[in-house]
A protein has these predicted regions:
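Conserved hydrophobic "DFG−1" position in protein kinase catalytic cores
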Residues: 9-10, 17, 84, 101
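Short coil/turn segments
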Residues: 20-22, 112
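A conserved beta-turn-beta hairpin within the catalytic core of GNAT-like acetyltransferases
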Residues: 24-28
Length: 123
């Protein structure tokens, strides 16, 4: 099983979701951005690194919200979700197709990656 971290970034009562790249597993699904934890890396350091790489922003991690396991024929992961806030104003996407700031009540109107839809209840 691979550990993955995801940032649930909240700003002005909206949450940031990003659309997965067309070449990735679950292409065009929406997700809370993040990525794989490297060997000997803490979840928090991995999350800060991934968000800087993918969105070009620095984040402040507030607390862990939940963990969800997902397995299919291609992947076997445990995703660790952290509530965060952005410390920057401008987001520059490097890996995603698109991004949106969405109210909690509207999150489930998007096709979310597995696991991400399950944690909406914790927000």
């Amino acid at each position: 099983m691979i550990d993955v971290v995801a940032a649930v970034i909240k700003k002005d009562n909206k949450y940031l979701i990003a659309q997965r790249n067309r070449d990735k597993h679950f292409a065009f699904h929406w997700e809370f951005p993040g990525g794989k934890v490297d060997k000997n890396e803490t979840f928090e350091n991995a999350l800060k690194r991934e968000i800087l790489e993918e969105l070009s922003i620095d984040i402040k991690i507030k607390n862990k919200i939940a963990s969800e396991k997902y397995k299919d024929e291609k992947i076997n992961v445990e995703v660790h979700y952290f509530l965060c806030k952005t410390l920057d104003l401008e987001i520059i996407l490097s890996e995603h197709e698109n991004m949106k700031w969405v109210l909690k009540k509207d999150l489930l109107n998007f096709t979310l990656a597995p696991g991400d839809s399950k944690i909406v209840k914790y927000l």
